[in-house]
Amino acid sequence: MTMRSLLRTPFLCGLLWAFCAPGARAEEPAASFSQPGSMGLDKNTVHDQEHIMEHLEGVINKPEAEMSPQELQLHYFKMHDYDGNNLLDGLELSTAITHVHKEEGSEQAPLMSEDELINIIDGVLRDDDKNNDGYIDYAEFAKSLQ
C-alpha cells in the first residue's frame, strides 16, 4: 500500500464516521471495515460518533441518540465546510486530512510533507469530484461513502 493511500485512508475513514454509529453497526457487519481491497479501513482509523459530537457541541442541539447516520454525515460535511459554501475545497480537505492525521498519530508522529498532502488532495478530487469543478459537494461526498 502506498503512502498516499495510507494517508488518504484516514481522511476517507473520517468521512465514513456515520457508519460507526451504534445503530449503523447493528445493520453493517464489522467485517466490512477490513475486507481485502477496501483500502485498509478499520475501526481504529474511523472517527466515531462521540468524536463528531465533541466538535458539534454547542452547534447542534439535537441529542446524538436522535440523529440518523445521514444527519451525522451531513453535520460532518458541514463542520469541514469552513466558508459555508456547501463545497469542500482543497484547503478544507487539507484541514480535515491533517486533523485526522494528528489525532491518529502519537505526539512523535512525523509531519506529513506538503507533497504528500497535495497528492492525497489531488487523489480525493480526482476520484470523488465527479463534475470536475475542483470541489467536493455534498452529493459527491455522500456518493464517495457508498
From Swiss-Prot:
Its job = The MCFD2-LMAN1 complex forms a specific cargo receptor for the ER-to-Golgi transport of selected proteins. Plays a role in the secretion of coagulation factors.
Q: Does the keyword Metal-binding apply?
A: yes
Keywords assigned by UniProt, alphabetized? Calcium, Disease variant, Endoplasmic reticulum, ER-Golgi transport, Golgi apparatus, Metal-binding, Phosphoprotein, Protein transport, Repeat, Signal, Transport
Q: Which PANTHER family match?
A: MULTIPLE COAGULATION FACTOR DEFICIENCY PROTEIN 2 (PTHR23104:SF14), MULTIPLE COAGULATION FACTOR DEFICIENCY PROTEIN 2 NEURAL STEM CELL DERIVED NEURONAL SURVIVAL PROTEIN (PTHR23104)
Q: What domain comment accompanies this record?
A: Essentially unstructured in the absence of calcium ions. Requires calcium ions for folding.
Which GO cellular component terms, listed alphabetically, does the Swiss-Prot or TrEMBL entry include?
endoplasmic reticulum membrane; endoplasmic reticulum-Golgi intermediate compartment membrane; ER to Golgi transport vesicle membrane; Golgi apparatus
Listed name of the protein: Multiple coagulation factor deficiency protein 2
Q: Which disease is it linked to?
A: Factor V and factor VIII combined deficiency 2: A blood coagulation disorder characterized by bleeding symptoms similar to those in hemophilia or parahemophilia, that are caused by single deficiency of FV or FVIII, respectively. The most common symptoms are epistaxis, menorrhagia, and excessive bleeding during or after trauma. Plasma levels of coagulation factors V and VIII are in the range of 5 to 30% of normal.
Q: Which gene encodes it?
A: MCFD2
